[in-house]
Design a protein with these regions (language model features):
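Short amphipathic, positively biased membrane-proximal segments
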Residues: 1-131
């Protein structure tokens, strides 16, 4: 399946890294359009406003998606994407701890191990840079 996507997309990304780019682009837009959804995820120990952190992280996700997608910047974009996905892990833990409803807690808890493939896909994208 990865090869089909590579040929069809023409951008040289496998299915995993391409999924990472799509997820980061969608998430980045949601961060900017509906920041209140993410504000409670910002750990209380972070300085400044939660809204500010959410907006900055949305811009960072969009920048990572774009630089990972574009072959000349893919190595840096993939590494930045992996670092960002590792860096937001504390916010995802905070969302799980703050979840009030059992269903919300279950969803946020199940999301935690998904950070691992996201980090790995960022690293994979960085390694797939055309030489």
């Amino acid at each position: 399946m990865s090869r089909r996507i590579r040929r069809r997309s023409g951008i040289g990304l496998g299915a995993g890294p391409l999924a990472l780019v799509g997820a980061m682009a969608v998430s980045g837009v949601i961060h900017l359009v509906r920041p209140a959804v993410f504000e409670r995820a910002v750990p209380r120990a972070m300085p400044g406003s939660a809204r500010g952190w959410v907006l900055v992280s949305g811009v960072a996700e969009l920048a990572c998606a774009a630089t990972t997608l574009w072959p000349p910047t893919r190595a840096v974009g993939g590494l930045a994407s992996a670092a960002l996905m590792a860096g937001v892990f504390p916010a995802n833990v905070q969302m799980t701890l703050d979840a009030r409803r059992p269903r919300t807690r279950a969803i946020t808890l199940l999301r935690l191990p998904l950070q691992i493939p996201l980090v790995l896909w960022g690293l994979q994208a960085a390694r797939s840079t055309p030489r």
